[in-house]
Amino acid sequence: MHVKKYLLKCLHRLQKGPGYTYKELLVWYCDNTNTHGPKRIIREGPKKKAMWFLITLLFASLVCWQWGVFIKTYLSWEVSVSLSMGFKAMDFPAVTICNASPFRYSKVRHLLKDLDELMEAVLARILAPESSQANATAAMNLSMWNYTPLVLIDERDPHHPVVLDLFANDPTGSASSSPGPRGACNAQGCKVAMRLCSLNGTSCTFRNFSSATQAVTEWYALQATNIFSQVPQRELVELGYSAERLILACLFGAEPCSYRNFTSIFYPDYGNCYVFNWGMTEKALPSANPGTEFGLKLILDIGQEDYVPFLASTAGVRLMLHEQRSYPFIREEGVDAMSGTETSIGVLVDKLQRKGEPYSPCTVNGSDVPVQNLYGSYNTTYSIQACLHSCFQTQMIASCQCGHYLYPLPRGQEYCNSRDFPDWAPCYLALRMSEAERETCIRMCKESCNDTQYKMTISMADWPSEASEDWIFHVLSQERDQSTNVTLSRKGVVKLNIYFQEFNYRTIEESAANNIVWLLSNLGGQFGFWMGGSVLCLIEFAEIIIDFVWITIIKLVALAKGLRQRQAQARYAGPPPTVAELVEAHTNFGFQPDVGHRSPDAEAYPDEQALPIPGTPPPNYDSLRLQPLDVVESDSEGDAV
């Protein structure tokens, strides 16, 4: 009951409002606020009132402008970077090594036979066009040539370039005049390009190169990709270099190791790659001390005599240092070690800690990245390279209806090949050169919030020396082939030393440059400096704003009620009837004579007199009219307040 009465009083209080006019409320605020300035506006003379009004308005505007600047700075989510140094024993990084040649030529020769013959003919046409013009091409398989041929572009006349097909007798071009003889087209006047045409030949584009070496290398790699994409991966593994053949000697610190301590993965660019200390099934190995003697030492046999001649133009190994349980993107982040040398790699560790949203667009584990991670089957941690490759493969499948051989496939998709997807090569090259598609993937992918980078200092020296070359190769050949004959040479071996330069590591950490404490401090400082205000002054200002809105709502409600009442009164001509008139209007008319409807027998009684109707006039009920509810409540409200 008390709660109901209290709520009813609150409702009446809301209906009545503050009880002030706008002017009275404003004067009350200026007289009672703790903010400097408004009191002088109402207490001084006319001139000083105007002066203090302008000063107060100026400083209030200045405070609002400063507040806007600080809030905008805070919402820009700027970060500050701190660098700290630490010293502790650290886990040795994972080391991935790959041979520069993905396959052994002796095992893939049958797959590349047609391509190699075509490549030799192409080189002959480019290097000696006159002597090779008469060579027959009927014996060669030109099916792969028809999809993406190499052409010569004669640019001696810049306004009328001529396109010359290497295996066609008649040149085709944009010039109306006949071009000069093929022999006259030298390296300065002609450029080798790759012609990319759709299946029906309606649209063609040319991929130009500044050197014929670049042109034939990329063309051969594109055709080799088309061939290897049709071979199952388990067979491709057998075509590459085995760990037992590649790794001749291994030593980690003072403990010997072997190829059995490496985990094998297949990387399409480099074939079989091997990871040391990956940490997938075993605990990461720690490094006892910095220095060469406490690192990883490897002697590798790259087997350069069995390289694919047109596919691998670099002799050596490709290696990469990375975190445990992370996938090695060795093509993008690896370094090369040259054969016939001892390569020493000193390692420094940088740990990156990004702040995260909204300060830095990073992700903890990739769960908030809208790209399917195609490397999830390897059970590795998230990386931006995995996201970029997965994004490109998704775009490749959407645009070309097939996936590229270099990247993992989503379930239910197929790798591209010219037999099933004749248009895949032009589609792939157009997608790879599309800046819009690259920007799309960059926007969708995020950096990892916590990352470890290994900075390498690389030095090289000839190995072995001429004085020790004979006995070292004898020992290594004996250990590998159990033969007294020397089967190794300087051009086929690589020695690696990987070690920590020092146990000092750097931590690069992001922190918020402007936090909420900074924002409140600056907002309060500006308000207090220019107007002598505080948080309570803001509450006072909010109170008067609420009262202004309250009064405005009450006035609008009263105005709406008045309009409805005037509309209702307009229906009647006179004033509204009183209670007595309403009661008299409902008097029983049964005792009144029926003057309008006289009986036909009325003339039979001419002397009949109309008798008076007895009755008592009704009381004056206007004197008992109740007062309006708001009048009664206003009296009681005064007592309550």
From Swiss-Prot:
Ubiquitinated. Can be ubiquitinated at multiple sites and undergo monoubiquitination and polyubiquitination. Ubiquitination by NEDD4 or NEDD4L inhibits the ENaC channel through endocytosis, intracellular retention and degradation of its individual subunits. However, some studies could not confirm the ubiquitination of this subunit of the ENaC. GO terms for biological process: multicellular organismal-level water homeostasis; sodium ion homeostasis; sodium ion transmembrane transport. Residues 632-641 have a biased composition (Acidic residues). Residues 72-533 are extracellular. The chain crosses the membrane at residues 51-71, 534-554. It is a multi-pass membrane protein. It is found in: Apical cell membrane; Cytoplasmic vesicle membrane. Originally identified and characterized by its inhibition by the diuretic drug amiloride. Belongs to the amiloride-sensitive sodium channel (TC 1.A.6) family. SCNN1B subfamily. This is one of the three pore-forming subunits of the heterotrimeric epithelial sodium channel (ENaC), a critical regulator of sodium balance and fluid homeostasis. ENaC operates in epithelial tissues, where it mediates the electrodiffusion of sodium ions from extracellular fluid through the apical membrane of cells, with water following osmotically. It plays a key role in maintaining sodium homeostasis through electrogenic sodium reabsorption in the kidneys. Additionally, ENaC is essential for airway surface liquid homeostasis, which is crucial for proper mucus clearance. This is Epithelial sodium channel subunit beta. It comes from Oryctolagus cuniculus (Rabbit).
